[in-house]
UniProtKB/Swiss-Prot annotation:
A Pfam family per the record: fn3
Name recorded for this polypeptide: Contactin-4
Classification lineage: Eukaryota, Metazoa, Chordata, Craniata, Vertebrata
Job description of the protein: Contactins mediate cell surface interactions during nervous system development. Has some neurite outgrowth-promoting activity. May be involved in synaptogenesis.
GO biological process, one term: cell adhesion
Region feature Disordered, mapped onto this chain: 685-710, 886-906
Length: 1026
């Protein structure tokens, strides 16, 4: 067997082999849990799980009821990957409490305890039961008496071979299995059988039937409830579980069940009630659910109460566990574990599976363990055990004691340490060593002695203050403990300090200006130097804020800052920070920025009338330039943004903080703001004042564009533009309409009490058509009447024409166009004529779907287009005016011409010579339903122009003279009485050269260039049209 120190040396050696091969004590991955094993299980095998990791691999053994399980002596036992397997388990031999014990070279840990129990359910011993005889109306209890068993049971009853259902009369207790009938009725007579089920094995057994009969000696009278099923006086309940309380009473009439808490608190909302309130179920039981509960059974004869106390308990639960500790020799170890539980847990400690007691260097107090002056024998596996009467929990940790000589291999002294003259330097010395070593220092070959400048700390660090050039050199730290000595050497280089030669100075500038803040230094040129600037404590980002900030200077000893287009937000403290690898320093300057004033504050409406408002405010910041004036602005729901307003005084100087706004509109909601100005500019506006409405006043603005006319017979229609709301001057705004026949003296008046009214119709049979009236419209509101608008002349409604147009005639112009003619109505016509309305429809369409077109004035003909070819159309004409249309003329008929040819000219061939183009094409023949071809139209234009010229010919060829060089686009289409037919594809003819050229419409890729022309000569008989 190795000594403890040998194990420690071996452990230290193995730790160095590989980072991914860490040696450690056993750690439980999975601990055994309680097992309820069904005796009738087909598997015939029990597994108690235990999984452990550790390096070296731990050895696993098991205990039952505190005694080692001898795997070799009983073939039924085997351990597979740490778990215990029991073949053909026996409830007599194998039931008990098991623990898993894991051990490797670092120590031993024990698992939590796990109980192995066996679930079974035997058959009922008796086969028959005595008959139960009861009176009608009497309460009854049928006993179940379950047979021997292990494991939780559930109960049900069968009544005459059918399941007995539960209601407010019947109740089956899941605690006793008994069947309770609160009040027996005739329908309850029969055989009752108790059914018992083991919830673990699902095995079910039936008890012997119990016959129930009714007695013949009368009926049971009414009586108060008698509680037969009630919960115990004390019911312990575990945290987080579901608690069920049962309560049922016999009685006549059938009692009702009510639950309540004795302390008056409401039962938790999560609680549920089942079986006609016979069961109170509380899920996820917590401390606040504990207390005294009452079951109240009540009927018309009285009530009874059953009481019981629900007590709360909780198994221990870790709040703070212990963790592995690696400690050097002669140091101390302190562990603390904490657990919650009800009742409060007690603590004990184990080392390598054995109890640990207080002695000498080891102090144990509840959940704390303190070991002083640690040595190698203290290494091992430790466990804190917390327990109460409801459970036990374990927390494990490993204590490693490190013993090694000083080693600098991973913590060498810094090779070079830079320091400035007059500065301070600390050289760290942190070798790995256990126990802590003793430190000495050398400079070169001389041992360093501590003095007022040189000190050596307890942890070995060397500190030198007020450094001089003579302190440069090599320094060696020597560490020594019981196991050996080691050293490490580093060099100190002393540099000249950095000094600021031209610092930035505080400045006073105006918005928009640009400045440079200097920052120039002298420094040791063997060191790199870095300049940084902060503004009000924040680092300036020259990339993000490059619009305003830029580093300038160009020399490594200058870090000047340029600030361009300075704004108010740039006022504040600027700090230049200079840093080298040996020192850093900073210098600061304040920048004051003068600019337009800030917004005034607390704009208040002190008094308001119908047209004025008295304002006051407090001045805002003047931004280092005195305020010279204030401007008042106002806004209403009707204005476009903020508008400057007139004030008294006219100009509000910078020392005045009140003003009267004049020229306001009455009964309008206003809000005001103030803008300050100084010699630099106009500042930001203040926040708006509260909204206030001016007082009411008489209206002053009259309606605009008073006019009218039109309407129906015997009507005078008067219209006007409404007065805008902001000019109505008060509530109750409306209009007064005044009118009289032209030349009369007496006005007729009508009042319209609506601000939105814009039209009035006077209807009277005495009103003659198209009679002149003098009209004016006035205004009023709740304050009184305002002025009237100027008088204007309005005509009454006219009468629609009374005579139809005469001499209606229509003719066809083409397949799509017809022309209609008519004459003015004959005889005296009472209504004036403003124009005519032509109605037309195709013979195949209905007249109500007819289309209409109108003419204006005295025009007595019109052209109708976009018609269908070869179609019969019906037409009629009416005269119209503002009153409507007059009677219709007689209907006339006209048929459009056949459609023009649909076939375009084909086989177009052209050739050119001596500035002439000759075109030839095939004759177009019309179809039977098309108009005969009368000739052809040749359309041509310059390639770069949109205007087109047209040549008509009755032949199938044409000759063009084109004196200028230009590309041409040419099309050809036939025409007939029905109109123009389909056009050929466009032909592009390029510029004409002296050489002979030719081409065809089928292919324009051979086309030659044509010259632009100003005159076209046709060599054959044709007529030209534009």
């Amino acid at each position: 067997m190795r000594l403890p120190w040998e194990l420690l040396v071996l452990q230290s050696f193995m730790l160095c082999l590989a980072d991914d091969y860490t040696l450690h004590g056993p750690v439980f991955v999975q601990e055994p849990s309680h097992v309820m094993f069904p005796l009738d299980s087909e598997e015939k095998k029990v597994k108690l799980s235990c999984e452990v990791k550790g390096n070296p691999k731990p050895h696993i053994r098991w205990k039952i009821n505190g005694t080692d399980v001898d795997i070799g002596m009983d073939f039924r036992y085997s351990v597979v990957d740490g778990s215990l397997l029991i073949n053909n388990p026996n409830k007599t031999q194998d039931a008990g409490t098991y623990q898993c014990i894991a051990t490797n070279s670092f120590g031993t840990i024990v698992s939590r305890e796990a109980k192995l129990q066996f679930a079974y359910l035997e058959n009922f011993k008796t086969r028959t039961r005595s008959t139960v005889s009861v009176r009608r109306g009497q309460g009854m209890v049928l006993l179940c008496g379950p047979p021997p068993h292990s494991g939780e049971l559930s109960y049900a009853w069968i009544f005459n071979e059918y399941p007995s259902y539960q209601d407010n009369r019947r109740f089956v207790s899941q605690e006793t299995g008994n069947l309770y009938i609160a009040k027996v009725e005739k329908s309850d007579v029969g055989n009752y059988t108790c059914v018992v089920t083991n919830t673990v094995t699902n095995h079910k057994v039936l008890g012997p039937p119990t016959p129930l009969i009714l007695r013949n000696d009368g009926v049971m009278g009414e009586y108060e409830p008698k509680i037969e099923v009630q919960f115990p006086e004390t019911v312990p309940a575990e945290k987080g579980t579901t608690v069920k309380l049962e309560c049922f009473a016999l009685g006549n009439p059938v009692p009702t069940i009510l639950w309540r808490r004795a302390d008056g608190k409401p039962i938790a909302r999560k609680a549920r009630r089942h079986k006609s309130n016979g069961i109170l179920e509380i899920p996820n039981f917590q401390q606040e659910d504990a207390g005294s509960y009452e079951c109240v059974a009540e009927n018309s004869r009285g009530k009874n109460v059953a009481k019981g106390q629900l007590t709360f308990y909780a198994q221990p639960n870790w709040v703070q566990i212990i963790n592995d500790i690696h400690v050097a020799m002669e140091e101390s170890v302190f562990w603390e574990c904490k657990a919650n539980g009800r009742p409060k847990p007690t603590y004990r400690w184990l080392k390598n599976g054995d109890p640990l007691l207080t002695r000498d260097r080891i102090q144990i107090e509840q959940g704390t363990l303190n070991i002083t002056i640690v040595n190698l024998s203290d290494a091992g596996m430790y466990q804190c055990v917390a327990e109460n009467k409801h459970g036990v929990i374990f927390s494990s940790a490993e204590l490693s004691v490190i013993a090694e000589s000083p080693d600098f291999s991973r913590t060498l002294l810094k090779r070079v340490t830079l320091v400035k003259v007059g500065g301070e330097v600390v050289i760290e010395c942190k070798p790995k060593a256990s126990p802590r070593p003793v430190y000495t220092w050398r400079k070169g070959r001389e041992i360093l002695r501590e003095n007022e400048r040189i000190t050596i700390s307890e942890d070995g660090n060397l500190r030198i203050i007020n450094v001089t050039k003579s302190d440069a050199g090599s320094y060696t730290c020597i560490a020594t403990n019981h196991f050996g000595t080691a050293s490490s050497t580093g060099n100190v280089i002393v540099k000249d300090p950095t000094k600021v030669m031209v610092p930035p100075s505080s400045m006073d500038v105006t918005v928009g200006e640009s400045i440079v803040l200097p920052c120039q230094v002298t420094h040791d040129h063997s060191l790199d130097i870095v300049f940084t600037w902060t503004f009000n404590g924040h680092l300036i980002d020259f990339d993000k804020d490059g619009d305003h900030f830029e580093r300038v200077g160009g020399q490594d000893s200058a870090g000047d800052l340029m600030i361009r287009n300075i704004q108010l937000k740039h006022a504040g403290k600027y700090v230049c920070m200079v840093q080298t690898s040996v020192d850093k320093l900073s210098v600061a300057a304040d920048l004051i920025v003068r600019g337009p004033p800030g917004p005034p504050e607390a704009v208040t409406i002190d008094e308001i009338t119908d047209t004025t408002a008295q304002l006051s405010w407090r001045p805002g910041p003047d931004n280092h330039s005195p305020i010279t004036m204030y401007v008042i602005q106002a806004r209403t729901p009707f204005s476009v943004g903020w508008q400057a307003v007139n004030t008294v005084p006219d100009l509000v100087d910078g020392k005045t903080f009140t003003a009267t706004v004049v020229g306001l509109n009455p009964w309008v909601e206003y809000e005001f703001r103030t803008v300050a100005a100084n010699v630099i500019g106009i500042g930001e506006p203040s926040r708006p004042s509260e909204k206030r409405r001016t007082e009411e006043a008489l209206p002053e603005v009259t309606p605009a564009n008073v006019s009218g006319g039109g309407g129906s017979k015997s009507e005078l229609v008067i219209t006007w533009e409404t007065v805008p709301e902001e000019l109505q001057n008060g509530r109750g705004f409306g209009y007064v309409v005044a009118f009289r026949p032209h030349g009369k003296m007496i006005w007729m008046l009508t009042v319209l009490a609506s601000a939105d009214a814009s039209r009035y119709v006077f209807r009277n049979e005495s009103v003659r058509p198209f009679s002149p009236f003098e009209v004016k419209v006035g205004v009023f509101n709740n304050k009184g009447e305002g002025p009237f608008s100027p008088t204007t002349l309005v005509y009454s409604a006219e009468e629609e024409p009374t005579k139809p147009p005469a001499s209606i005639f229509a003719r066809s112009l083409s397949a799509t166009d017809i022309e209609v003619f008519w004459a003015s109505p004959i005889g005296k016509n009472r209504g004036r004529i403003q124009g005519y309305e032509v109605k037309y429809w195709r013979h195949d369409d209905k007249e109500e779907n007819a289309k209409k077109i109108r003419t204006v004035g005295n025009q007595t003909s019109t052209k109708i287009t976009n018609l269908k070819g070869s179609a019969l159309y019906h037409l009629s004409v009416k005269a119209y005016n503002s009153a409507g249309t007059g009677p219709s003329s007689a209907t006339v008929n006209v048929t459009t011409r056949k459609p023009p040819p649909s076939q375009p000219p084909g086989n177009i061939i052209w050739n050119s010579s001596d500035s002439k183009i000759i075109l030839n094409w095939d004759q177009v023949k019309a179809l039977d339903n098309e108009s005969e071809v009368k000739g052809y139209k040749v359309l041509y234009r310059w390639n770069r122009q949109s205007s087109t010229s047209v040549i008509e010919t009755n032949k199938t060829s044409v000759e063009l003279s084109l004196p200028f060089d230009e590309d041409y686009i040419i099309e050809i289409k036939p025409f007939s009485d029905g109109g123009d037919g389909s056009s050929s594809e466009q032909i592009r003819i390029p510029k004409i050269s002296n050489s002979y050229a030719r081409g065809s419409g089928a292919s324009t890729s051979n086309a030659c260039t044509l010259s632009a022309i100003s005159t076209i000569m046709i060599s054959l008989t044709a007529r030209s049209s534009l």
